[in-house]
UniProtKB/Swiss-Prot annotation:
<dbReference type="Pfam" id="PF05843">
    <property type="entry name" value="Suf"/>
</dbReference>
<dbReference type="InterPro" id="IPR045243">
    <property type="entry name" value="Rna14-like"/>
</dbReference>
<keyword id="KW-0539">Nucleus</keyword>
<feature type="modified residue" description="N-acetylserine">
    <location>
        <position position="2"/>
    </location>
</feature>
<feature type="repeat" description="HAT 4">
    <location>
        <begin position="163"/>
        <end position="196"/>
    </location>
</feature>
<dbReference type="GO" id="GO:0005654">
    <property type="term" value="C:nucleoplasm"/>
</dbReference>
<dbReference type="GO" id="GO:0005848">
    <property type="term" value="C:mRNA cleavage stimulating factor complex"/>
</dbReference>
<keyword id="KW-0677">Repeat</keyword>
<comment type="subunit">
    <text>Homodimer. The CSTF complex is composed of CSTF1 (50 kDa subunit), CSTF2 (64 kDa subunit) and CSTF3 (77 kDa subunit). CSTF3 directly interacts with CSTF1 and CSTF2. Interacts with FIP1L1.</text>
</comment>
<comment type="function">
    <text>One of the multiple factors required for polyadenylation and 3'-end cleavage of mammalian pre-mRNAs.</text>
</comment>
<feature type="modified residue" description="Phosphoserine">
    <location>
        <position position="691"/>
    </location>
</feature>
<keyword id="KW-0507">mRNA processing</keyword>
<keyword id="KW-0007">Acetylation</keyword>
<feature type="repeat" description="HAT 3">
    <location>
        <begin position="117"/>
        <end position="152"/>
    </location>
</feature>
<feature type="repeat" description="HAT 5">
    <location>
        <begin position="221"/>
        <end position="261"/>
    </location>
</feature>
<dbReference type="GO" id="GO:0180010">
    <property type="term" value="P:co-transcriptional mRNA 3'-end processing, cleavage and polyadenylation pathway"/>
</dbReference>
<feature type="repeat" description="HAT 6">
    <location>
        <begin position="271"/>
        <end position="303"/>
    </location>
</feature>
Length: 717
């Protein structure tokens, strides 16, 4: 029993690094470093134990061909072929990854070889693969493997032989016009194949295909260039907003744009669309969490569908139209289940195709997700219902929205304005606003929307009554009423007399006495400002302690990528405009206090030594320590003096003259000039040299084994 317990405990043992990885994944399910640890651990475990990890992996990254391949290879290794085929059924059609498809072909080749129908199944597998992944730039090996497979098929009789030749030729001809790496080699193999069958017929066959091949070869080079730098094995993760990610997104979009530019210069719109959609599919394997890629892919299919319909190709037009809907469906069913943007675009697309029932199902599907804010969904749903089925249908959606506890005040504003603009009945809109005020009277945004509506109707008395009700009812907390008071003051400034303006100002100051104590003048600014015009300069506003409540709030709610309006007005005075120059970071500076007689190897200024770069640190660790070098040591001063006095010749003739001590003598022998064997009678002396000084300092003696001089001596003997 103790042995069994120990074995069970050992089986349940979890390494510390795996525990840390699991903890990281709880914080961030897309942490690739943590997943790498789990993958390595799973690869060292039996498949029955590792299968759970692999399932989690492909569930988290359903578009990663690399992870699917790891899972499948683990099952193949364990000879679980029934599970392998189910895995291929789950991923093969959705993940057009070249390595995954090569794995599929290898699996069919190795496991179906003994079946009687092996040849038919293998040929079908190759045709299926080339149809789906044949446009891949790295698909050369699949084409070659298919051709070699067909060549190896046994053919008995002339009819079977002709069939085999036709099949091989068909694959060669398809491949030679398909842009990919190594297309030149495929073309050379095709030429040899045709010449081996019939050398007389080969010339015509090759000439017929030569033009298309040259076009494909040109495109293949462009294809290779545009694909360079793309990280095609990266798993799809939510946008990280890093420079590296932005660069990859830009490169993917350039590749897609290149395919849209029709580099093959074909008039076949179907072929162009297929190539562009293949580019989108490759992009979505990596950028599947980016909604813009899904939307642009669907838009392109919709445009292609309309173009083909105009040309009369109704079958392909309908095919592409349905495929556009399928793109939206895939997006909201897999990686972007909560992305409202794609739901709304999908609904609008189906609305354009007059499929209203489908639109209802799309909106209801989104509303069924519990952990979302359904307010915007109801708003768009109401607008669709009003457009497609009339105002009564819109009211039914509004009723449904009111019953949903998750809904916020925006739905009431939308419903009221829809009634006002569409049914032209301001009394119904008024009732909806009043109904919403009972529920959302403590939300200043709702109150302001109601005020805007009444101002639009130019009903001064009702507007003033609403201000008084909201500000005196106590439903709105004082800290939230700042913008309401500012709007009340603006309202009185536009239509009231001076007495009413002063009265509102006084009441406002009383409400915010603690905040504006000693800053009464700051409140005066709101009386005279208009839109972005202010009665003081920016520096004066700052000195007054003025805060623009509306603009501060606007800046807070606008997302970071959008540039929010400045809280202070744009200044017109040139005096206040100060030029912005790049300035050094003075916080990082250190005082210049050099050491006296600094030891060798130390920086003269304390703290002035910068850390060695990481690459140099690695190199320094690999090098032996300084004590290992005992010499010889170079006399740097003397070496530099030799370089300084060395005269470098500008021409070959001058170099020969310096070496030989005179001009080269040429003798014509046979068919060309041959250098004469002039004997050097004295040592070569450099110009501008003083022999006496050299003797005093010690002449530079040439090395004993000077190969160059030895060769020169052999030449002149």
């Amino acid at each position: 029993m103790s042995g069994d317990a120990a074995a069970e405990q050992a089986a349940e043992y979890v390494p510390e690094k795996v525990k840390k990885a699991e903890k990281k994944l709880e914080e961030n399910p897309y942490d690739l470093d943590a997943w790498s640890i789990l993958i390595r651990e799973a690869q060292n475990q039996p498949i029955d134990k590792a299968r759970k990890t692999y399932e989690r992996l492909v569930a988290q990254f359903p578009s990663s061909g690399r992870f699917w391949k790891l899972y499948i290879e683990a099952e193949i290794k364990a000879k679980n072929y029934d599970k392998v085929e189910k895995l291929f059924q789950r991923c093969l059609m959705k993940v057009l990854h070249i390595d995954l498809w090569k794995c599929y072909l290898s699996y069919v080749r190795e496991t179906k070889g003994k079946l009687p129908s092996y040849k038919e199944k293998m040929a079908q597998a190759y045709d299926f693969a080339l149809d789906k992944i044949g446009m891949e730039i790295m698909s050369y090996q699949i084409w070659v493997d298919y051709i070699n497979f067909l060549k190896g098929v046994e053919a008995v009789g002339s009819y079977a032989e002709n069939q085999r030749i036709t099949a091989v030729r068909r694959v060669y001809q398809r491949g030679c016009v398909n842009p990919m790496i190594n297309i030149e080699q495929l073309w050379r193999d095709y030429n040899k194949y045709e010449e081996g069958i019939n050398i007389h017929l080969a010339k015509k066959m090759i000439e017929d295909r030569s033009r298309d091949y040259m076009n494909a070869r040109r495109v293949a080079k462009e294809y290779e260039t545009v694909m360079k730098g793309l990280d095609r094995n990266a798993p799809s993760v939510p946008p990280q907003n890093t420079p590296q990610e932005a660069q990859q997104v830009d490169m993917w979009k350039k590749y897609i744009q290149w395919e849209k530019s029709n580099p093959l210069r074909t008039e076949d719109q179907t072929l162009i669309t297929k190539r562009v959609m293949f580019a989108y599919e490759q992009c979505l394997l990596v950028l599947g969490h980016h909604p813009d890629i899904w939307y642009e892919a669907a838009q392109y299919l919709e445009q292609s569908s309309k173009l083909l319909a105009e040309k009369g190709d109704m079958n392909n037009a309908k095919l592409f139209s349905d495929e556009a809907a399928n793109i939206y469906e895939r997006a909201i069913s897999t990686l972007l289940k909560k992305n409202m943007l794609l739901y709304f675009a999908y609904a609008d697309y189906e609305e354009s195709r007059m499929k209203y029932e489908k639109v209802h199902s799309i909106y209801n599907r989104l509303l069924a997700i519990e952990d979302i804010d359904p307010t915007l969904v109801y708003i768009q749903y109401m607008k669709f219902a009003r457009r497609a089925e009339g105002i009564k249908s819109g009211r039914m959606i509004f009723k449904k929205a009111r019953e949903d506890a998750r809904t916020r005040h925006h739905v009431y504003v939308t419903a009221a304005l829809m009634e006002y603009y569409c049914s032209k009945d301001k009394s119904v809109a008024f009732k909806i606003f009043e109904l919403g005020l009972k529920k959302y009277g403590d939300i200043p945004e709702y109150v302001l929307a109601y005020i805007d509506y009444l101002s639009h109707l130019n009903e001064d008395n009702n507007t003033r009554v609403l201000f008084e009700r909201v500000l005196t009812s106590g439903s709105l907390p004082p800290e939230k009423s700042g913008e309401i008071w500012a709007r009340f003051l603006a309202f009185e400034s536009n239509i009231g007399d001076l007495a009413s303006i002063l009265k509102v100002e006084k009441r406002r100051f009383t409400a915010f006495r603690e905040e504006y104590e000693g800053k009464e003048t700051a409140l005066l600014v709101d009386r005279y400002k208009f839109m972005d015009l202010y009665p003081c300069s920016a520096s004066e506003l700052k000195a007054l302690g003025y805060k623009d409540v509306s603009r501060a709030k606007l800046a807070a709610i606008i997302p970071d990528p959008v540039v929010a309006p400045s809280i202070v007005p744009v200044l017109k005075d040139e005096v206040d405009r100060k030029p912005e120059y790049p300035k050094p970071d003075t916080q990082q500076m250190i005082p210049f206090q050099p050491r006296h007689l600094a030891p060798p190897g130390l920086h003269p200024v304390p703290g002035g030594v910068f850390p060695v770069p990481p690459a140099a640190v690695v190199l320094m660790k690999l090098l032996p320590p300084p004590i290992c070098f005992q010499g010889p040591f170079v006399q740097v001063d003397e070496l530099m003096e030799i370089f300084r006095r060395c005269k470098i010749p500008n021409t070959v003739e001058e170099a020969v003259r310096i070496i030989t001590g005179g001009a080269p003598e040429l003798a014509v022998e046979g068919n060309g000039p041959v250098e004469s064997s002039a004997v050097l009678t004295k040592a070569v002396k450099r110009p501008n040299e003083d022999s006496d000084e050299d003797e005093e300092k010690g002449a530079v003696v040439p090395p004993v084994h000077d190969i160059y001089r030895a060769r020169q001596q052999k030449r002149i003997r």
